């Protein structure tokens, strides 16, 4: 047996951090586990990530954005996720197809039926076994992201640039991308879309308050994953 767990949530909810903590815990416990992310996770998907999230592409059409995310996802599923699941491992993914429904569907108003068809084509119908939703009020999450952005800029200014290496532009800041910069109303629609999806499929989704202390949230996630590990063989 294998296990496919995805992390979803508003911007700044701590998905990436908690996914790393869970990966480290499972690895130390002897489970075969990998952590990947969307968009990204392969050289091709990472190239798409740089394109689709770059702040300079303000004129990108919603349909173009949707198809780029789907292309990155197709590569990640085919190259990384499916092969590891077939080996009986645990795959943790920081965002997956639900992000498309939330952002391009509810956020940008793309047709949800069409998005489901695109997603089915890109993933071969692969669904997560479990999705952890880290919930946080939109403004609180964006405040966290702004702080991360500002800290990044400050540290970049303090560091001495190496003349033989290309220096990142502000648009390449992983802590603040083209989607982060959208208006509050967009992010509110995204969060509302997530909540609708959770209500429609409560067996797959587990909701956590991302506003609590980081250590407490980690403990809750570790407890939540335990019942799903009974069929996974450890490496030892």
Curated annotation (Swiss-Prot):
InterPro entries: P-loop_NTPase, Thymidylate_kin-like_dom, Thymidylate_kinase. ATP binds at residues 9-16. It catalyses: dTMP + ATP = dTDP + ADP. The keyword Cell membrane does not apply. GO terms for molecular function: ATP binding; dTMP kinase activity. It is an enzyme of class 2 (transferase). Its EC number is 2.7.4.9. One of its GO terms (biological process) is dTDP biosynthetic process. It holds the Pfam family Thymidylate_kin. It comes from the Bacteria. The keyword Cell cycle does not apply. One of its GO terms (cellular component) is cytosol. Keywords: ATP-binding, Kinase, Nucleotide biosynthesis, Nucleotide-binding, Transferase. Belongs to the thymidylate kinase family. Phosphorylation of dTMP to form dTDP in both de novo and salvage pathways of dTTP synthesis. HAMAP family: Thymidylate_kinase (MF_00165). This is Thymidylate kinase. It comes from Herpetosiphon aurantiacus (strain ATCC 23779 / DSM 785 / 114-95).
């Amino acid at each position: 047996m294998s296990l496919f767990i995805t992390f979803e949530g508003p911007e700044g909810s701590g998905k990436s951090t908690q996914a790393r903590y869970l990966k480290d815990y499972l690895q130390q416990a002897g489970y075969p586990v990998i952590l990947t992310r969307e968009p990204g996770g392969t050289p091709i998907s990472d190239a798409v990530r740089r394109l689709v999230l770059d702040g300079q592409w303000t004129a990108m059409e919603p349909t173009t954005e949707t198809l780029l995310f789907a292309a990155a996802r197709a590569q990640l599923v085919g190259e990384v996720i499916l092969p590891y699941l077939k080996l009986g491992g645990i795959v943790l993914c920081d965002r997956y197809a639900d992000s498309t429904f939330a952002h391009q569907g509810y956020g940008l108003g793309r047709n949800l039926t069409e998005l489901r068809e695109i997603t089915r084509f890109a993933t071969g119908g692969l669904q997560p076994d479990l999705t952890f939703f880290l919930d946080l009020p939109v403004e609180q999450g964006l405040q966290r992201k702004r702080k991360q952005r500002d800290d990044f800029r400050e540290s970049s200014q303090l560091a001495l640039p190496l003349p033989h290496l290309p220096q990142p532009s502000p648009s390449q800041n992983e802590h603040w991308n083209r989607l982060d910069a959208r208006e509050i109303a967009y992010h509110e629609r995204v969060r509302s879309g997530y909540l609708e999806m959770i209500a429609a499929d409560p067996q797959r989704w587990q909701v956590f308050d991302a506003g609590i202390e980081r250590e407490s949230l980690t403990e809750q996630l570790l407890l939540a994953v335990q019942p799903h590990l009974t069929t996974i063989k450890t490496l030892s």
